[in-house]
Design a protein with these regions (language model features):
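NAD(P)H-binding glycine-rich loop region in Rossmannoid oxidoreductase-like domains
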Residues: 36-80
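SDR active-site strand-loop-helix element
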Residues: 8, 32, 77-78
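N-terminal Rossmann NAD(P)H-binding glycine-rich loop of SDR-like oxidoreductase domains
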Residues: 3-27
Length: 80
């Protein structure tokens, strides 16, 4: 099974590049964002089901923990 990465801020300028690149390398990509319905375009970065946006509030520990659940790696592209 492909490894899973969670990318925080994966819909931003740098995050988009990283999400695309990791999908091309065969990773399953979870893009953690504030408004997943506004970034559905990230699904086009891979095959069906490979890249998924999820809701995450980085100021809430439980939300971050849920976003990281099962991930093999994490990338932070969020500026606070």
């Amino acid at each position: 099974m492909a490894k899973l990465v969670t990318i925080f801020g994966g819909s931003g300028f740098i995050g988009r590049y990283i999400a695309r690149r990791m999908a091309k390398q065969g990773w399953r990509v979870r893009v953690a964002v504030r408004r997943p319905n506004e970034v559905l375009f990230v699904k086009t970065y891979g095959v069906v089901g490979q890249v998924e946006p999820i809701l995450c509030n980085i100021r809430d520990d439980a939300s971050v923990e849920e976003a990281l659940n099962g991930a093999d790696a994490a990338v932070n592209c969020v500026g606070i």
